[in-house]
């Protein structure tokens, strides 16, 4: 794997709440990572301008808003995301097949295949444990639920899933080589675990079959964020040779 290929797998999580910080990070890292994640805090604070701020620096955007609502509402939200020009957008697989199908159909109807956003379904959050699932009435093991939701997502027209790195291999086996797998819960060897429960190193995740890695604090909190991003690229390249 080349350094450029490894770099393009990194999605930097913009865990900020204002446009000035977006400009700072996008300018600093646009050549060091493949994409920027705009999540709930940032989008609630800055709105669509957050996406435009990233694109101003030639950055691609993963709009991480995890839609979960009635099918028509989610379909309209995905159309709005597509009009913003984001590369990836997501919803919760637990919203069910009709919700996912409506979103997929709406996006494919309005946009060409090359221009449309790729739609991802969130399976089980990486902060969740077996106890978390039991508390909300889900008795199935985490991995079983993740694979079940991933298969449902594929059948419902999703392009891929967001899932813990520990479930990558099972998802790949169940859903095939062309199904996108985006994984948070990735921590390079030099970083702290923080609040993610089911984790791997970047190299381990890529080797297991991840297409994209969502990484925030290990880069943002580093003394030298640019160097941290480069070290992660080094780890990936060295680990998958």
From Swiss-Prot:
Report a single Gene Ontology molecular function.
orotidine-5'-phosphate decarboxylase activity
InterPro entries reported in the protein's UniProt record: Aldolase_TIM, OMPdecase, OMPdecase_AS, OMPdecase_bac, OMPdeCOase_dom, RibuloseP-bd_barrel
Cross-referenced CDD domains, in alphabetical order?
A: OMP_decarboxylase_like
Tell me a GO cellular component.
cytosol
One of its Pfam families is OMPdecase
Annotated keywords: Decarboxylase, Lyase, Pyrimidine biosynthesis
User: What EC number is given for this enzyme?
Assistant: 4.1.1.23
Active site residues of this protein:
66 (proton donor)
According to UniProt, this protein's pathway is: Pyrimidine metabolism; UMP biosynthesis via de novo pathway; UMP from orotate: step 2/2
Residues reported in the UniProt entry to bind substrate = 15, 37, 64-73, 126, 187, 196, 216-217
Describe its function: Catalyzes the decarboxylation of orotidine 5'-monophosphate (OMP) to uridine 5'-monophosphate (UMP).
Subunit architecture: Homodimer.
Query: What PANTHER family does the database record attribute to this sequence?
Result: OROTIDINE 5'-PHOSPHATE DECARBOXYLASE
Family, as annotated: Belongs to the OMP decarboxylase family. Type 1 subfamily.
For this entry, the protein name equals Orotidine 5'-phosphate decarboxylase
């Amino acid at each position: 794997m080349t350094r450029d290929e490894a770099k393009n797998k990194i999605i930097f999580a913009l865990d900020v709440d204002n446009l000035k910080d977006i400009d700072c990070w996008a300018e600093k890292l646009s050549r060091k990572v493949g994409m920027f994640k705009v999540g709930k805090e940032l989008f609630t604070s800055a709105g669509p301008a957050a996406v435009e701020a990233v694109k101003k620096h030639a950055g691609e955007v993963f709009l991480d808003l995890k839609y979960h609502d009635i099918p028509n509402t989610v379909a309209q939200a995905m159309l709005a995301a597509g009009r913003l020009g984001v590369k990836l957008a997501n919803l919760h697989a637990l919203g069910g097949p009709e919700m996912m199908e409506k979103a997929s159909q709406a996006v494919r109807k309005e946009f060409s295949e090359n221009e449309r956003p790729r739609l991802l379904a969130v399976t089980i959050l990486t902060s969740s444990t077996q106890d978390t699932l039991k508390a909300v009435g889900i008795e199935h093991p985490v991995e079983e639920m993740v694979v079940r939701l991933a298969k449902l997502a594929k059948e419902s027209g999703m392009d891929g899933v967001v899932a813990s790195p520990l479930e990558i291999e099972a998802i790949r086996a169940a859903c095939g080589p062309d199904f996108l797998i985006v994984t948070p819960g990735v921590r390079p060897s030099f970083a702290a675990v923080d609040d993610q429960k089911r984790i791997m190193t970047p190299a381990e995740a890529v080797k297991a079959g991840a297409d994209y890695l969502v990484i925030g604090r290990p880069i943002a909190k580093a003394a030298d964020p640019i160097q941290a991003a480069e070290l992660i690229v080094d780890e990936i390249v060295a680990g998958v040779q």
